[in-house]
A protein has these predicted regions:
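Helical element adjacent to the flavin cofactor pocket in flavoenzyme catalytic cores
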Residues: 131-181
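Gly/Ala-rich phosphate-binding loop of Rossmann-like dinucleotide-binding domains
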Residues: 12, 16, 151
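Glycine-rich Rossmann-fold phosphate-binding loop(s) that bind the pyrophosphate
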Residues: 3-9, 27
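Conserved dinucleotide-binding and phosphotransfer motif residues
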Residues: 18, 103, 154-155
Length: 182
């Protein structure tokens, strides 16, 4: 697997736990230095198109109840989010609320008075109302990445850092990868 960010580490964890031989290759001196390390790290079933929301819902149980020993602290902590709307965005906000409700995600509609109480920094003359998502979470991306890496190694995966793949070829049974360190 090339890349030891969250995607590569989670794949290594799954494959190694399934008994597959895994080598995880990372060009940086440590995993998670790029997009994983800069992730906004929100878990929101209300975010994204329907396919993304379905994947988010499907992963909720894992994040709330990871396998024993996966992480020392919870991976998720509650975080509310607001979707604000100007006067011209009311119809879109209504469609969003209906679309989310159809997939089982309930949101609370805040009028301008409740919105001003919830977010006093927002300009009350600009935003008419908002949807409040009380089912969102902050994700501990570092704990998640470390859980995947630790679990992958415990299941036999090897992690190589500071090397780059130069060429790769499949021989019919496995991949052979030439690395920058020889």
């Amino acid at each position: 697997i090339i890349g030891a960010g969250i995607a590569g580490a989670s794949l290594a964890w799954r494959l190694a736990r399934a008994g597959r031989p895994v080598v995880l290759i990372e060009r940086e001196p440590q995993p998670g230095m790029h997009s994983t390390g800069r992730s906004a790290a929100m878990f929101m079933e209300s975010y994204g198109p329907p396919g993304v929301r379905a994947l988010t819902r499907a992963s909720r149980d894992f994040y709330l109840h990871p396998p024993a020993g996966f992480a020392e602290a919870p991976l998720l902590s509650p975080r509310h989010a607001l979707f604000v709307a100007t006067a011209g965005q009311q119809a879109a906000l209504g469609r969003m609320q209906a679309d989310l409700a159809a997939s089982g995600t309930t949101m609370t509609l805040l009028n301008s008075e409740l919105l001003a109480q919830a977010a006093p920094a927002l300009k009350p003359d600009l935003f008419q109302n908002a949807l409040l998502d009380e089912q969102g979470y902050d994700m501990d991306v570092h704990a998640l990445l470390q859980g995947f890496l630790r679990g992958a190694r415990q299941a036999g995966a090897r992690l190589l850092t500071g090397v780059q793949p130069l060429r790769a070829a499949h021989d019919g049974q496995r991949w052979r990868v030439a690395l920058s360190d020889g």
